[in-house]
Each structure stands twice: as structure tokens, then as C-alpha cells.
Regions:
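N-terminal single-pass transmembrane signal-anchor helix
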Residues: 1-47
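Short, exposed beta-strand "edge-strand" segments with a Pro/Gly-rich flavor and a Y/T-containing core
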Residues: 8, 62-69, 124-129, 178-179
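Glycine-centered flexibility motif
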Residues: 16, 63, 83, 100-109
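Membrane-proximal N-terminal amphipathic helix
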Residues: 30-67, 71
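Short, glycine/small-hydrophobic-rich surface segments
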Residues: 58-93
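Intrinsically disordered, low-complexity regions enriched in Pro/Ser/Thr/Gly and acidic residues
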Residues: 91-205
Length: 205
């Protein structure tokens, strides 16, 4: 009788151990996935930050070298020729002229496209094919102010010059027809990301 009890208890204990291992395995995989996603997201944000630094430094040169500049697509080619684009975003062997309308491609198929607009917003960096998490982290990141980094606003969606239409003196976030302070709050970001193809537009003067 005691032996049967011991065998039964041993089996129950073994099942308990297996259940714990299963829970830990699922939790471990979940943690690894979150860490990988966070790492990838940080890489995308770092790349966008480096790109933005190059853009804001080059936009005045672009205006001087391209009199009457109005076609935003031409700035992609200009940045490529000036070697102001990270090598990791360039397709091997592609000519700079190929970047007139084609965005630069990074990790996880995230793409970067530069649009020269002129006016209050001189240039916009479009970052597309973002996951919801990437989008939310990007729009809640502090990209600076008009006086420090030249950053004047962020929007999500296809309308590249949404920020250009508002009368603002400080960095703003545009969601639909509403203007919010930048960076976006988490609630605003959750509303913006996931419903507009997750294209983030970072606008600089």
C-alpha cells in the first residue's frame, strides 16, 4: 500500500515538475522574443536618429546645390551621392540614381525615405513597414526640439507633410486632425499606430 502511495506521489511530483518546466519554457521563449523585438526596435530608432542627423546637416547644402529644389525624391539621390546614408541601408551595387523614388532598406524590411518639402518643414524622414511596437516606441521617443535638433513634429500615416499644415512653435504630434505635444503619450501612440500602415514621418526644419 505504501509502495503504491509512493509511486502515485512520485508520478504526481513528476507531472508537477514537468508542468513547471513547461511554464518556464513558455515564459523563457516569451522573454527572448520580447528582448529580440526590443533590440530590433532600438536598432531602427538608432538608425533613424543617425539618418536624421545627416539630413539636417545636408538639407542646406541640398538647397544650395539644387536651385529651385521642389522634387522631394531628388534628395534621396543627393544624400546617396554625398555618402550621407549608412552603408547598411544601401543595396549592394545599386546606383544612387535608383534612390530617386525607392526608399533605403534596413533590417526587418523597415524602409527609410527622405522627402524635401521646403517651407516650415524643410525635410521629412519617412520610416515605413514598422510593427506596432516599433511605431509606438518611435513616436514616444524624444527627438528634440526646433531649437536643439531642428525636430518640429511627428505624424503617422501616408500624409508626409501633416506637420507642415499646422501653425506651431514647438514640436508637435499630429494624429488625424488633432495636434498633441511631442513626443506622443502612450495612449495617443496606441491610437495612432496600427491603423495607418505604421508609416512614421519625422519632420525637421
Amino acid at each position: 500500500m505504501n509502495k503504491m502511495n509512493e509511486n502515485g506521489r512520485s508520478m504526481i511530483e513528476m507531472l508537477g515538475v514537468l508542468a513547471i518546466i513547461g511554464v518556464l519554457s513558455v515564459g523563457g521563449f516569451s522573454l527572448i522574443n520580447k528582448m529580440q523585438t526590443s533590440y530590433t526596435t532600438n536598432q531602427v530608432i538608432d538608425t533613424a536618429g543617425d539618418f536624421a542627423n545627416h539630413i539636417t546637416k545636408m538639407v542646406r547644402e541640398y538647397e544650395l546645390d539644387t536651385p529651385g529644389a521642389s522634387n522631394g525624391d531628388l534628395m534621396n539621390e543627393y544624400l546617396c551621392k554625398a555618402k550621407a546614408v549608412p552603408d547598411s541601408l544601401l543595396e549592394g551595387g545599386a546606383a544612387c540614381s535608383d534612390y530617386k523614388e525607392n526608399p533605403f532598406s534596413g533590417i526587418n524590411d523597415v524602409t527609410y525615405n527622405v522627402k524635401y518639402i521646403g517651407g516650415k518643414v524643410s525635410v521629412v524622414l519617412q520610416v515605413a513597414n514598422l510593427t506596432d511596437e516599433m511605431c509606438m516606441q518611435m513616436v514616444t521617443t524624444n527627438w528634440g526640439t526646433p531649437g536643439t535638433s531642428g525636430f518640429i513634429g511627428v505624424s503617422v500615416g501616408d500624409e508626409v507633410d501633416a506637420v507642415n499644415k499646422g501653425e506651431v512653435n514647438d514640436a508637435v504630434a499630429i494624429v488625424g486632425n488633432k495636434t498633441h505635444p511631442a513626443p506622443m503619450g502612450v495612449g495617443t501612440a496606441a491610437k495612432a499606430c496600427g491603423s495607418n500602415n505604421n508609416i512614421v514621418n519625422l519632420s525637421f526644419k
